[in-house]
């Protein structure tokens, strides 16, 4: 018998429950002990008479297809992994899994159906290179991780209102997603998915961390607050419109978005950590941050911009580096800001294509020259492939090779000019 001993106990419990109550056709609960493993459909059939199973169920081995019938709740986790012959799986009666739903290393699995599933703690879908269909009726989940799959859609998560972690990475055929999420208490990450990925999070009001890479279009129509860090790195976005956003609690990073020509953050007043705009080659006019008043770390703006409007800026707790290759850019307004004591860090640098001003704020020396006296935070936009942080038990593998594939590291707020340089360097590694 291929099912572990726990299944024998389950069958006995089921028979006993039926004998004790002849009016009940399905026992309310069947215990499989701490855990049990099924390697054949016959093993799963042994618990088909249960509406609830208690314990962790693992499905593995040489199954061509598999199904869990009648079971409505798993008081534990369901893991399906390392089956080279499993092509389809269905459990359309399950409404609730109190633990995790793990699907990993299923190389020919094309479909997984959980049509009634509304509640689960976490879903981890990792290394599913053939899957095209995944369905749920999901309403509540804490963590969602989808990595290294061939899914074209993740609509099975489209009705979720809140999560802790939402991490979608290295899914080369995934080109669009429209979400109903209203809050993300830990992190929202999209990276290394299909070409021209389009995302819409128009109901999202609050998030702790957001990092987007390799995205072509994004909509945040209602986003008001990011409690920690917000990063847009190596995207093909033509524009960024976050006109409802008023506060970023830690760092704000807009780095190496080669097609970005407009950034509108018209209600943003506070950046609690480092503020970085770097290497966005088409961003010639930076006028969407004109209401920013305070920056709690250092500020770094580098590129080919002719206009930079920071007209409301009153305080920068760290250093400041402004470096434009355009000779049309004027440092006058920024030099006035520095002379009024608004820059509180250890240095102030402002350069355009013709002149340079560098001030060490810890001393009284001022240097002006026509040559570049201070190195900028410029770097190439190419980043190495990297695995996303999917979970302690499952690591993603990259399934695509286009520019800068990999999840962004969390950017630590800089408190000095050199801190900003280090933060940009980390982002581009």
Curated annotation (Swiss-Prot):
Residues 361-410 are annotated as: Disordered. Glycans are attached at residues 21, 56, 82, 196, 209, 227, 234, 241, 267, 279, 304, 328, 389. The modification Phosphoserine is found at residue 339. Gene3D superfamilies: Receptor L-domain (3.80.20.20). A lipid is attached at residue 406 (GPI-anchor amidated glycine). Residues 361-401 have a biased composition (Low complexity). Residues 1-19 form the signal peptide. SUPFAM superfamilies: L domain-like. Residues 407-429 form a propeptide. The GPI-anchor is attached to the protein in the endoplasmic reticulum and serves to target the protein to the cell surface. There, the glucosamine-inositol phospholipid moiety is cleaved off and the GPI-modified mannoprotein is covalently attached via its lipidless GPI glycan remnant to the 1,6-beta-glucan of the outer cell wall layer. GO terms for cellular component: endoplasmic reticulum; extracellular region; fungal-type cell wall; mitochondrion; plasma membrane; side of membrane. Belongs to the SPS2 family. Present with 6500 wall-bound molecules/cell in log phase YPD medium. This is Cell wall protein ECM33. The gene is ECM33.
């Amino acid at each position: 018998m291929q099912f572990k001993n726990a299944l024998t106990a389950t069958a006995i419990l089921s028979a006993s429950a039926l004998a004790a109550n002849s009016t009940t056709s399905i026992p309310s609960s069947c215990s499989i002990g701490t855990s049990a493993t099924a390697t054949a459909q016959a093993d799963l059939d042994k618990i088909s008479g249960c509406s609830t199973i208690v314990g962790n169920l693992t499905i593995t081995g040489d199954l061509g297809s598999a199904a869990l019938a009648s079971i409505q709740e798993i008081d534990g986790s369901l893991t399906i992994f390392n089956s080279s012959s499993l092509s389809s799986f269905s459990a359309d009666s399950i409404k609730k899994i109190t633990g995790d739903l793990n699907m990993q290393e299923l190389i020919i699995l094309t479909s997984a159906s959980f049509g009634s599933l509304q509640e689960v703690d976490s879903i981890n879908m990792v290394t599913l290179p053939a899957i095209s269909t995944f369905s749920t009726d999901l309403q509540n989940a804490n963590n969602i991780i989808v990595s290294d799959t061939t899914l074209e859609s993740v609509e099975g998560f489209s009705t979720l209102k809140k999560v802790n972690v939402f991490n979608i990475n290295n899914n080369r055929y995934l080109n669009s997603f429209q979400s109903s999420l209203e809050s993300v208490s830990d992190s929202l990450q999209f990276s290394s998915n299909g070409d021209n990925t389009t995302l819409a999070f128009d109901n999202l009001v609050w998030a702790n961390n957001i990092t987007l890479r390799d995205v072509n279009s994004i909509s945040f129509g209602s986003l008001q607050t990011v409690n920690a860090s917000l990063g847009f790195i190596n995207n093909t976005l033509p524009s960024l419109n976050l006109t409802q956003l008023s506060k970023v609690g830690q760092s704000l990073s807009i780095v190496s978005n080669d097609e970005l020509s407009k950034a509108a953050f018209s209600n943003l007043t506070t950046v609690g950590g480092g503020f970085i705009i770097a290497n966005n080659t088409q961003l010639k006019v930076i006028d969407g941050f004109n209401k920013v008043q305070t920056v709690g770390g250092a500020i770094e703006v580098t590129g080919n911009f002719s206009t930079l409007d920071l007209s409301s800026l009153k305080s920068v707790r760290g250093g400041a580096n402004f470096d434009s290759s355009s000779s049309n850019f004027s440092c006058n307004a920024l030099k006035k800001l520095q002379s009024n004591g608004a820059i509180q860090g250890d240095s102030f640098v402002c350069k355009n294509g013709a002149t340079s001003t560098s001030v060490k704020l810890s001393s009284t020396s001022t240097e002006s020259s026509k040559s570049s006296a201070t190195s900028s935070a410029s770097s190439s936009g190419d980043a190495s492939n990297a695995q996303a942080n999917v979970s302690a038990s499952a690591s993603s593998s990259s399934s695509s090779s286009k520019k800068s594939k990999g999840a962004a590291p969390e950017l630590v707020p800089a408190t000095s000019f050199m801190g900003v340089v280090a933060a940009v360097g980390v982002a581009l590694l």
